[in-house]
């Protein structure tokens, strides 16, 4: 048995009614926020080179780099805490992890900047 035929206008009206119902029933979808270090990377760039810009692709690469380094430091600090039978990762573990992961002069600068940041944080409390 063939389905009943409807005129073109009737089909359009039925379609519009269907759309109106489905539009009202659907809730507005919220976009999930993507966390990024982009604003912080940009602030540092402007401190170092105020007249220099950065492309979105370069910013994405820098963001991936920061995430990768943080992951490596966290993993190394976790390993160090485990070796020493500690359940807490302190600034000491982070400092040792940085010394192990970063080469030479870069490690020295990172440790001094980290120490400065921790001192500033504890003095503000």
Curated annotation (Swiss-Prot):
This chain is glycosylated at 112
Against SMART domains, the record matches this protein to: H2B (SM00427)
Q: Name one GO molecular function term.
A: protein heterodimerization activity
Give the stretches traversing the membrane: none
How is this protein annotated for GO cellular component?
Answer: nucleosome; nucleus
Q: Where is this cross-link: Glycyl lysine isopeptide (Lys-Gly) (interchain with G-Cter in ubiquitin)?
A: 120
Sorted alphabetically, the keyword list is: Chromosome, DNA-binding, Glycoprotein, Isopeptide bond, Nucleosome core, Nucleus, Ubl conjugation
Q: Which InterPro entries match?
A: Histone-fold, Histone_H2A/H2B/H3, Histone_H2B, HISTONE_H2B_site
- Compartments it resides in: Nucleus; Chromosome
Task: Please report the PTM annotation for this entry.
Answer: Monoubiquitination of Lys-120 gives a specific tag for epigenetic transcriptional activation and is also prerequisite for histone H3 'Lys-4' and 'Lys-79' methylation. GlcNAcylation at Ser-112 promotes monoubiquitination of Lys-120. It fluctuates in response to extracellular glucose, and associates with transcribed genes.
Gene3D superfamilies, per this entry?
Histone, subunit A (1.10.20.10)
Query: What segment(s) does the record annotate as region Disordered?
Result: 1-33
Q: Which Pfam families match?
A: Histone (PF00125)
Q: According to its UniProt entry, what is the function of this protein?
A: Core component of nucleosome. Nucleosomes wrap and compact DNA into chromatin, limiting DNA accessibility to the cellular machineries which require DNA as a template. Histones thereby play a central role in transcription regulation, DNA repair, DNA replication and chromosomal stability. DNA accessibility is regulated via a complex set of post-translational modifications of histones, also called histone code, and nucleosome remodeling.
Give the family this protein belongs to, as stated in its UniProt record: Belongs to the histone H2B family.
Q: How does it assemble?
A: The nucleosome is a histone octamer containing two molecules each of H2A, H2B, H3 and H4 assembled in one H3-H4 heterotetramer and two H2A-H2B heterodimers. The octamer wraps approximately 147 bp of DNA.
**What name has this protein been given in UniProt?**
Histone H2B
What is the source species? Answer: Chironomus thummi thummi (Midge)
């Amino acid at each position: 048995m063939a389905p009943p035929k409807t005129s073109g206008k009737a089909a359009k009206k039925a379609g519009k009614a269907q759309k109106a119902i489905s539009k009202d029933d659907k809730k507005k979808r919220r976009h999930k926020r993507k966390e990024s270090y982009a604003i912080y990377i940009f602030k540092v760039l402007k401190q170092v080179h105020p007249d220099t810009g950065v492309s979105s692709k370069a910013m994405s690469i820098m963001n991936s780099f920061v995430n990768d380094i943080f992951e490596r430091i966290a993993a190394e600090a976790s390993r160090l805490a485990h070796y020493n039978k500690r359940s807490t990762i302190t600034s000491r573990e982070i400092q040792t992890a940085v010394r192990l992961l970063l080469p030479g002069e870069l490690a020295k600068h990172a440790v001094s900047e980290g120490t400065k940041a921790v001192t500033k944080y504890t003095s503000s409390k």
